């Protein structure tokens, strides 16, 4: 990302915060059922099974009285069979077809870090690593969309269902095998991830 692009995005969020009619801080706590991951570069598919929980803090800046459009920034942490931290930002769209349901879609750019223990070495496709397990570190840069379905919404607390879809166009993996750190160089790496979840949202 060049400097002009970076400062352009920073200016966009600055003006959105300055001129937005409403700013909402939203806390989210939830459970992710699974992660479906597909690596385009080496044609591999993974189904992680139950992943664990997530806690996030989001700031939404909406324009107008109806709160249909705005921008957001989000900091999230995941824990379970892995640990992760992520910063995401982008536009936010919101619609409430009735009093029971509110739909919120948030396309985003993201920067993330993930750590997983005891990964199967064979999944890396390198026989030189031998067999057994390894600790994996991953740095991600990508984009995606999170869709929230708020149910029985109230002013402060709302249960919700959601889907997170992301594409990592930059991904660097490191594995720790018997105390030695190996760098995995994926050419043209592209990682697709689909994650359904359930949780509760708290508006401050």
What is the meaning of each model-derived region?
Residues 1-24, 204:
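Cleavable N-terminal export/targeting peptides
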Residues 19-80, 199-201:
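Short glycine/proline- and aromatic-enriched beta-strand/turn motifs that initiate or cap beta-hairpins
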Residues 32-36, 76-82, 110-118, 166-172, ...:
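Structural signature of outer-membrane beta-barrel domains
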Residues 37-46, 83-89, 116-127, 172-181:
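Outer-membrane beta-barrel translocator domains and adjoining extracellular loop/strand segments
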Residues 45, 146-204:
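Predominantly the C-terminal beta-signal and adjacent terminal strand-loop region
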Residues 47-49, 101, 135-137, 188-190:
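A generic structural micro-feature
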Residues 54, 84-86, 195:
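Short hydrophobic/aromatic beta-strand or adjacent loop that forms the aromatic wall/cage
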Residues 58-159:
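Gram-negative (and chloroplast) outer-membrane scaffold detector with strong preference
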């Amino acid at each position: 990302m060049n400097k002009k692009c970076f400062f352009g995005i920073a200016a966009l969020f600055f003006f959105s915060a300055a001129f937005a009619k409403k700013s909402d801080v939203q806390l989210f706590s939830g459970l992710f059922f699974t992660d479906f991951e597909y690596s385009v570069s080496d044609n591999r598919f993974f189904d992680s099974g139950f992943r664990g929980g997530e806690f996030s803090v989001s700031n939404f800046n909406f324009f107008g009285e109806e709160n249909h459009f705005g921008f957001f920034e989000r900091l999230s942490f995941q824990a379970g069979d892995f640990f992760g931290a992520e910063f995401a930002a982008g536009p936010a769209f919101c619609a409430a077809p009735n009093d029971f349901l509110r739909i919120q879609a948030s396309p985003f750019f993201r920067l993330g870090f993930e750590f997983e223990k005891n990964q199967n070495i064979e999944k890396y496709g390198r026989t030189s690593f031998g067999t057994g397990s390894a600790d994996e570190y991953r740095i991600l840069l990508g984009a995606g969309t999170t869709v929230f379905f708020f149910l029985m919404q109230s002013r402060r607390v709302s249960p919700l269902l959601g889907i997170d879809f992301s594409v990592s166009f930059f991904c660097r993996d490191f594995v720790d095998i018997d105390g030695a750190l190996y760098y995995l160089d994926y050419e043209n790496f592209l990682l697709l991830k689909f994650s359904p979840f359930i949780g509760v949202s708290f508006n401050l």
